[in-house]
Structures are given as structure tokens and as C-alpha cells.
Amino acid sequence: MRIKILIIVLFINSCSYPEIIRDELVYDNDFETKSLLNIDGGGFKKFNNSTVLGDFNNDGFTIHLDNVGDHEYVFVSFDLYIHGTWDGNFNGFSENDKADKWSIELKPDMDLHKNLSSEIFTTTFSNSPCWPNYCLRQSYPQTYPAENNPKKGSFTTDIGDKLCNESFFGGPSTLYKIEKGFQSRGDAVVLRFYDELYQPNAIDKNGIPQEKCDESWSIDNIKIRVISYK
């Protein structure tokens, strides 16, 4: 009987989770003070009764954090606003069609050392309606090119009016509350947030490009934690 008990105890101990020895918040920015500390790129705007970083269109920003100390994982959480008429995995063009992609990338300038499966998260978003005969699907909450219905995983939909009230282009926004983790080593954390939007038809009747009015994104409430295990 004692042998059986010992075997059970050893089995339970062998299946226990690693002990967390460090879980530290190293960055926290809600942008209400309009601080660009540790940020390269971007400006501010008021949206949804808050100050946000954005809006971006075929653009992005980078967070550089030094002296964060030894760690094994980095976790980033944030509020992401998808503005306007994002089309997800397909824009519906018969030739040279492309997705509306959005990415977070760890250590974006170190391509020779990347394990792309763990150091970049690329997905798509769609604010399209979804009818039986028309539905431009998105990848989120999975990575591209997975297919899910528009706005899946969202926190709030149909927020506000167009960002450009006088423009034909654009539409309401969708809010996603996102957390992503990456394996990370060293004393620094560098994270790049960016999009790759495809909008060949975002041109008004006067021939003036309207890409940013048509589709863009903003971000708020960024928190970054580093974690180590025993």
C-alpha cells in the first residue's frame, strides 16, 4: 500500500507545472498623458472617449524596452481598434488579390535569428457583413490564413461613426482585447506592431486616395510583462 501511495505522489509531482519565479510588468501605457516613451512611430487621437495611439494605415510603430532583466517569455496585452471596411483574407478582386493583414513581431530587425512560428503573430480582420452569398472572412483569433467569420473574438462591434465623417469611405469600428506571448531571451524587448492593407479602389471621384479614411487601426492600454520559470 505504501508503495502505491509513493508512486501516486511521484506521479503528481512529475506532472506539476513549472514554478514562476518572475512575473513583472515592465511597460504600461494608456496614452492619456500622450507619452511616446519607448515608442518609435505614431501619434495620438481621441476615440471612444479615450486617447489612443493611431490611426495607422500601411504603417505601424515599435516599442523598445532596455534593461528589463533576464526572462524567458514576454506577454503583451492591448486594446485594438479596427476602423472602417477591413476585408479579411480576401478583398474580392479577381486578379492579384491580397489580404488585409495585421502583425505583432518580436525583435523585428533580427531576421537571421528568427523562428517565425513563435516570434511573429500575423492575422487578418474583417468588418464585412456575412451573408450566405457574401462573407469576407478573417483569420483572427487564429493566424493567417485560417478562416473565421467577420468580427469573431471581438469585444465590442459597431463603435462610433466613420473616422472621416465627410468621406464616402470607411465605417464603424470593432474593438478586440488581445494578449499574445512569445519566447524571449536577453535584457531587451523590441516589439513591432504593423499592418499590410490592400485598397486599390480607395480613391474618391476626384481621384484623391482615401486609404486612411477607408481602413485603419488604433491601439490603447498596452501592457508588457516578462516571465521566468524555475
PLM regions: where:
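Sec-dependent N-terminal signal peptides
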Residues: 4-13
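Extracellular carbohydrate-recognition regions
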Residues: 15-43, 111-129, 133, 230
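Short carbohydrate-recognition loop motifs
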Residues: 40-59
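Short beta-strands within extracellular/lumenal beta-sheet-rich domains
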Residues: 55-77, 96, 100-102, 172-180, ...
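Extended extracellular/luminal ectodomain segments enriched in beta-structured repeat modules
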Residues: 68-78, 82-84, 185-190
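Extended, low-complexity, turn-rich repeat/linker tracts enriched in Gly/Pro/Ser/Thr and Asp/Glu
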Residues: 71, 81-98, 129-131, 199-202
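Short edge-strand/loop segments of extracellular domains
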Residues: 93-113
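Terminal, low-complexity interaction segments
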Residues: 139-230
